[in-house]
């Protein structure tokens, strides 16, 4: 089990200790720093819904450093990002691959960021099947359906046409931050907090 840092804050009522993720949540920051599975997705969905209930008008900042993961788990987070009222600003630090890249692209338009040395990768969904031939066929058809769904989502958020997305995701397709900006996965490549805040302020005008 990874060690989770604790933050101690002083107040009029004395000291209060938070784990680092809870403290970030107070500032409307969600951090995905692992592969995506059902447990991780449920935590992120819960945080998104909580922050919406706290203030439906204030942006949520979603930092992503993820190699991807389970498609259905990632789709739960994606759908929640689109469902809630606040804009979700996304920031790639390290890498956003597979479902991580899709979530990065799904941020509010004009509020999708990459740090300069981040790596972004898109590809088609992975899957395996075993059992009777009819079961394998069902699983194969489902993977093909999910590939179409994911390609459609990437097309919607990047502005690339569906056929290009399908072609590019046929194999692992790696991009730098600048290349991801050109592709339409992010809107800005920023090296500092000041640059990010300036870009956000310009979007609000």
Swiss-Prot record:
Keywords: Cytoplasm, Hydrolase, Protease, Serine protease. It catalyses: Hydrolysis of proteins to small peptides in the presence of ATP and magnesium. alpha-casein is the usual test substrate. In the absence of ATP, only oligopeptides shorter than five residues are hydrolyzed (such as succinyl-Leu-Tyr-|-NHMec, and Leu-Tyr-Leu-|-Tyr-Trp, in which cleavage of the -Tyr-|-Leu- and -Tyr-|-Trp bonds also occurs). Its EC number is 3.4.21.92. Disulfide bonds: none annotated. GO terms for biological process: protein quality control for misfolded or incompletely synthesized proteins. Pfam families: CLP_protease. One of its GO terms (molecular function) is serine-type endopeptidase activity. The active site is at 98 (nucleophile), 123. Fourteen ClpP subunits assemble into 2 heptameric rings which stack back to back to give a disk-like structure with a central cavity, resembling the structure of eukaryotic proteasomes. Cleaves peptides in various proteins in a process that requires ATP hydrolysis. Has a chymotrypsin-like activity. Plays a major role in the degradation of misfolded proteins. This is ATP-dependent Clp protease proteolytic subunit. It comes from Desulforapulum autotrophicum (strain ATCC 43914 / DSM 3382 / VKM B-1955 / HRM2).
């Amino acid at each position: 089990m990874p060690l989770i840092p604790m933050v101690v804050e002083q107040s009029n009522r004395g000291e209060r200790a938070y784990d680092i993720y809870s403290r970030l949540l107070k500032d409307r920051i969600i951090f995905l720093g692992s592969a995506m599975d059902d447990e991780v997705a449920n935590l992120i969905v819960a945080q998104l819904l909580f922050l919406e209930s706290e203030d439906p008008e204030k942006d949520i900042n979603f930092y992503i450093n993820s190699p991807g993961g389970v498609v259905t788990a990632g789709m739960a987070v994606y759908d929640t990002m689109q469902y809630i009222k606040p804009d979700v600003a996304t920031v790639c630090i390290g890498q956003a691959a597979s479902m991580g890249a899709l979530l990065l692209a799904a941020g509010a338009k004009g509020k999708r960021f990459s740090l300069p040395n981040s790596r972004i990768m898109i590809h088609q969904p992975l899957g395996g099947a075993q059992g009777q031939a009819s079961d394998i066929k069902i699983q194969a058809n489902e993977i093909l359906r999910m590939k179409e769904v994911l390609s459609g989502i990437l097309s919607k958020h990047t502005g690339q046409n569906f056929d290009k997305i399908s072609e590019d995701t046929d194999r692992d397709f790696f991009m730098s931050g600048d290349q991801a900006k050109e592709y339409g996965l992010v809107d800005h490549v920023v090296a500092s907090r000041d640059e990010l805040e300036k870009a956000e302020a310009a979007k609000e005008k």
